A protein has these predicted regions:
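Auxiliary tRNA-acceptor-end handling modules of aminoacyl-tRNA synthetases
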Residues: 1-18
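Charged, compositionally biased N-terminal leader segments and the immediate start
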Residues: 1-6, 170, 175, 182
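Acidic, His- and aromatic-enriched active-site or binding-groove loops in soluble protein domains
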Residues: 62-70, 174-200
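Short glycine/threonine-rich loop-to-helix capping motif typified by GTGT followed
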Residues: 167-177, 269-275
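Polyanion/phosphate-binding surface patch
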Residues: 41-75
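Short, conserved phosphate-binding/catalytic loop or strand-edge motifs used
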Residues: 120-124, 158-168
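Positively charged, Gly/Ser-enriched RNA/tRNA-binding surfaces
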Residues: 18-36, 47-50, 72, 82-95, ...
Length: 284
């Protein structure tokens, strides 16, 4: 017989010591963001599903769905706060100039990102809107480095990609939605044989480029390799040049830098530079 107090898998209580520690970090990080001009917003836990997925279906499978008892419409529990903050900037703030927003809160996902992670992770971050160019990206990178220092993470590894590379390839290939979803999964798994199988109907140039993306990860030398094997498309050339500029700008920082051109998470609602951060003190 199941214990009535048993929690679902990958969901847990946070006891006093952990809760106090998390709250201390939350306050320190939000104070840091406020000092740099980022205004705090609190999006709702629930939204209509079409609003949560208005910029793409990237998080659809991770989203818990319920029927609104008032309207009968399908609602979702947020699995990521980032699209919500983008919605707030686009539809509520109406600022034609630069907007800096910060956020913090729990999200809920149908499955954990790994067997070591919770399905109810706490998400905190800052978003910069209306300011394009390398200066904007460097501002966010610098703020993130300060955030990591605030929570005691030293010598992190920054893993960069520029989504214009992938989106340029698929835009000129006219790939159907279902195939694109399967290609995305194969890219995330770095399953080169599956990418080869899925792209058989594409023209030779783009097919070879998509297959090559899977193996294009490593240090800055990967960018030189990418220049050789990827099409001489203007958007791709600009993206690789941008990544080279980021590398030069951040070399003075106490971080390690790597690149993964097949890491296309969020490509449906993000554009430009994207990155992940890894540290010995964290799982991911």
């Amino acid at each position: 017989m199941m214990n009535q107090w048993t929690l679902p898998d990958y969901v847990e209580d946070m006891l006093p010591d952990e809760a106090v520690y998390l709250e201390s970090l939350r306050r320190s990080i939000l104070d840091l963001y406020q000092a740099h001009g980022y205004f705090y917003v609190i999006p709702p836990m629930l939204e209509y599903i079409e609003s949560l997925n208005s910029n793409g279906q990237d998080m659809d499978l991770d989203t818990f769905k319920v029927v609104d008892q008032l309207s009968g419409r399908l609602m979702g529990v947020r699995a990521d706060i980032t699209p919500q903050v983008a919605r707030i900037d686009a539809h509520l703030i109406h600022n034609e100039e630069v907007t800096r927003l910060s956020y913090a809160g729990s999200v809920l996902r149908t499955k954990p990102a790994s067997f070591l992670q919770s399905r109810e992770p706490f998400q905190i971050g800052a978003e910069l809107y209306g300011f394009k160019g390398i200066e904007a990206d460097l501002e966010i990178q610098t703020l993130l480095i300060k955030t990591l220092n605030t929570i005691g993470i030293k010598t992190p590894v920054f893993d960069f990609n520029h989504l214009d590379i992938f989106t340029s390839l698929i835009a000129s290939s006219n790939i159907e939605r279902d195939l694109l979803d399967r290609l995305y999964e194969a890219m995330q798994k770095k399953d080169q044989s599956e990418v080869k199988s899925l792209t058989q109907s594409l023209d030779k140039k783009n097919r070879e480029a998509l297959i090559a993306l899977v193996s294009l990860y490593g240090d800055v030398n990967i960018l030189k390799e990418a220049e050789k094997v990827l099409p001489q498309d203007k958007a791709i050339k600009n993206a690789l040049q941008f990544l080279n500029q980021i590398d030069k700008a951040l070399k003075a920082s106490d971080i390690k830098i790597s690149y993964d051109l097949s890491d296309i998470r969020g490509y449906q609602y993000h554009n430009g530079l994207v990155f992940s951060v890894y540290a010995d003190q964290c799982y991911s």
